């Protein structure tokens, strides 16, 4: 299994996004968490990836953060892992951060903007045939 594949579920494959340089910011963030906090995300991801299409998780665990660009967040405790669903039943985790307040701060909103740009980068690179081919 490639180092960018996080979880291969019955319904979805969950992957870490790689930028053009091969960096995986969300994976690096995840690896810096204590094991019990990693396990919390592991459990949420496995549940969603193994569930039938159309399964909805509670908003306390998985929430739509940007409806226009279909950006979601896995929400293990006070961490947020931005992601989106794409063709081939893939969930791509782009970036992550530790939430500090009830509402999204300006810093959180700026991160969301970079997540949207990364999503667009992923889609362009996949369409151009130089995302998976480059990292194979």
Mark where each language-model region is.
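Basic, Lys/Arg-enriched alpha-helical interface segments
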Residues: 1-78, 88-90, 98-136
